[in-house]
Structure formats: C-alpha cells, structure tokens
C-alpha cells in the first residue's frame, strides 16, 4: 500500500486528516513520523489503542537513538500519564510494560490504583499493590469509589489490604446507599460503618433514588427516616418512588412537613400515583398558594393538573400563575384545559401570549390569540421578543394579526 503514492503525498493526507493510525501499520509508514505536523502524542495514542507491539517497537527505536525519536520524545511524565490511563481502562499488559520502562505507579498521589478501584479492575489493583501502590492515598479514595460504584470484590480486597471504610465521615457507606449497592452496604455495615453520619445521609439519598431494599435495610439497622425534616419521604415523593414513599409512611414518616413539600414536589414533577396516595393521607394540595397546581401546570403534567382540580385546587391562584407559565413553557393541552376551567389568559398585561411568543411556542400563541389575547400589550412586547429570539414564524403570525415591529 505504501508504494502506491509518493511519501510527500502520504504526509499531506495524514496532516489533513489528523489521523496517525496509518503510520502504525508498517515500518515504511512509521518512518514518516518526522515529516508530519500532527501534535498527537504517539505513545499516548499507542497506549489508548492497546497496540503493545507498536509500543515495544517505538521504545526499541528510542534505545537505538533512531532519528525519528528526535521529534517523538518519550519522558517519564508521558509514561506516567499513559500508565494512569491504562489503569482506568484495564490494560494490564500495557501497564506491566510501562512499569518495566520506568513508569511510576505512585504518580499523582497513587492515581493509578484509585482509578483502577473506581472502575472495577481487580487484577490491575492487585498488580499495583504488589508493586507498592498505596491504597490509602487521598483519604482512602480507592475503597470509597469502589464502594460508590458497587464493586464488592474490590472493596473486600482493599479492606484486606488495610483500607479504612470509615474514611471521610463514612463516605463509602453513604454513597453505596445512594447508588443502590445493597451488598456493599451490608458488607460495610458488618465492618462497622456508621449509616447515620451526615444527618442520616444514607437513607435520605437511598430514598431519593428509589432503592427500597436499601431503605428497608437501613431502617432495620437504626436509620432515622425522619431525619432532616423528613427529607427521605419528601425526596422519594419528588422523584416518584411510590413504593419507597409507601414504606416510609408505614414507618412513621410525616408527609405534611415543610408545608406539604412531598405533594408539592410530586405534583411539580408529574408523579400522579404518588400525588393520589399523598392526598389519600390528607396532604394539602393547596399549600404554598396552590404550589402543586401552579408547578404541575408550568411543567406540563396534564393528568396531575386535572386531578388537582378535581380535589379543589385553585387554578387562578397568584394572578393565574398556572395558565401563564403553562403558556410560557408551551404546554398547549394544559393551557386549553385551564382555560376550560376558567383561567384568565389576559392577566398580567397578557403575560401568557407575551411569554409564549418570547419562548417560541407558536401553537400556544395561536390558541391564545384565538381566545382574545392582546398581542400588542406592553408596547408590542410579544413581537419584539419573538424577533429578538429569532422565532420567525411567530413574528410573521403576530404581524398578520396586527402587531407592529419597530426598529430600535
């Protein structure tokens, strides 16, 4: 293949493409390295692509002081960088070779063993430890991240090597709980991890993320479900984790704290099943000036909006906030429903049509105009901002309806 073009043409092709993989296909191409302008670190590229034979050849040229090495300098710093990346990517054969060339496994505060632990590469960790890596560097980063990412075998190995599972205020068990790694959580607790640190962080965030089995286990170990003003049930509701909410309530969680935070956030995020359940427990859907209906409307959750209205929510609260922000965010079906329930689209100097225009919501704008919205309110705010934001179709429509677009 090399012979089909002149070397200078190959150089131009490689410089134009920025790709050096062709240079690694045979020795003839490899000789072109000194002629190209690419800034690619050759060693790093070779390691990234797991080309150990190419790496060995490259190092051989260095030992022979081949002219090509005048441009491609191999330093300990570059070897260390490649070692760390190889540990992250589980390239044990290249790791061993880099170490044989002088790469420092402890470079960057033992970054290599930390990243191998974080990414679940047990054999790499064992090799690095055999070479003297410090698993406790950076406040036991290795065991913390192995726990956080659910690598039980690595956690056990690091513990056998002296890792402190309670480092950084029991970070390991807190994040294993938050990320849903039950086996890791149980193992850490069996070794004395404190599940109640940071104001019961573990159960709060396990609840927030919907890990029912972990929540149940933490409760069995003495976690306080009501910590931090019933944060657990509030965040479980906010994220729609019905089973977790139901369980926390069965354990005594108070759904009404913080001005009915639970039902407000469940409504805001569109979790109808949770909303209905909380209402069945006497949650106040009208708390905080009808926050629930306002934000479910603003976020476009039509079924939640309908349910809240059926339960007595005031769609006109705070100067028709619901229809104004449903319009602003382009939720046409919600806007139509609210209008059908008596919402006033013209409140706030025709806020709804002005901000629907500004936000580029053409269908909402058309509907509001059809319902009698004044597109010229606030000195033709609607067309000015539609123009400013680049919404050409809205500008055309508004002008066709009598809006006046003036030059500043």
Curated annotation (Swiss-Prot):
ANK repeats lie at residues 78-107, 108-137, 139-167, 168-197, 198-227, 229-257, 259-287, 288-317, 318-347, 349-377, 378-407. The keyword Iron-sulfur does not apply. Keywords: ANK repeat, Repeat. PROSITE patterns: ANK_REP_REGION (PS50297), ANK_REPEAT (PS50088). InterPro entries: Ankyrin_rpt, Ankyrin_rpt-contain_sf. Pfam families: Ank, Ank_2, Ank_4. Signal peptide: none annotated. This is Putative ankyrin repeat protein L483. It comes from Acanthamoeba polyphaga mimivirus (APMV).
């Amino acid at each position: 293949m090399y012979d089909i073009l002149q070397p200078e043409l190959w150089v131009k092709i490689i410089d134009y493409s920025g790709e050096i993989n062709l240079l690694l296909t045979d020795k003839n191409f490899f000789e072109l390295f000194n002629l190209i302008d690419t800034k690619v670190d050759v060693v790093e590229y070779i390691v990234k692509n797991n080309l150990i034979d190419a790496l060995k050849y490259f190092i051989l040229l260095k030992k022979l002081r081949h002219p090509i090495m005048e441009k491609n300098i191999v330093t300990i710093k570059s070897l260390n960088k490649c070692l760390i990346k190889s540990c992250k990517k589980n390239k044990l054969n290249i790791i061993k070779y880099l170490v044989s060339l002088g790469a420092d496994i402890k470079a960057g505060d033992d970054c290599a063993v930390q990243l191998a632990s974080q990414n679940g590469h047990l054999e790499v960790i064992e090799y690095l430890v055999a070479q003297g890596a410090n698993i406790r560097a950076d406040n036991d980063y290795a065991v913390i991240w192995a726990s956080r990412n659910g690598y039980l075998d690595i956690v056990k190995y690091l513990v056998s090597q002296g890792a402190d599972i309670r480092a950084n205020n029991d970070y390991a068990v807190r994040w294993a709980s938050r990320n849903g790694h039950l086996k890791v959580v149980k193992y850490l607790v069996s070794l004395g991890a404190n599940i109640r640190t940071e104001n019961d962080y573990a159960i709060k965030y396990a609840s927030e993320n919907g890990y029912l089995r972990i929540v149940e286990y933490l409760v069995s170990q003495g976690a306080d479900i009501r910590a931090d003003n019933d944060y657990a049930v509030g965040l479980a509701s906010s994220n729609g984790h019905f089973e977790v909410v139901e369980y926390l309530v069965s354990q005594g969680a108070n759904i009404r704290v913080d001005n009915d935070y639970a039902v407000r956030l469940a409504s805001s995020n569109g979790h109808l099943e949770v909303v209905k359940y909380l209402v069945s427990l006497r949650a106040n859907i009208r708390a905080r000036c009808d926050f629930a209906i306002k934000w479910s409307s603003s976020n476009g959750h039509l079924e939640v909006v309908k349910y809240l209205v059926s339960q007595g929510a005031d769609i006109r609260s705070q100067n028709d906030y619901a229809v104004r922000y449903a319009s602003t965010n382009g939720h046409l079906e919600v806007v139509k429903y609210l209008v059908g329930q008596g919402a006033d689209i013209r409140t706030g100097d025709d806020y709804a049509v002005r901000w629907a225009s500004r936000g580029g919501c053409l269908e909402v704008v058309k509907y509001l105009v059809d319902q009698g919205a004044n597109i010229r309110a606030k000195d033709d705010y609607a067309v000015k901002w539609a123009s400013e934001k680049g919404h050409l179709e809205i500008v055309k429509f508004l002008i066709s309806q009598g809006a006046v677009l003036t030059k500043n």
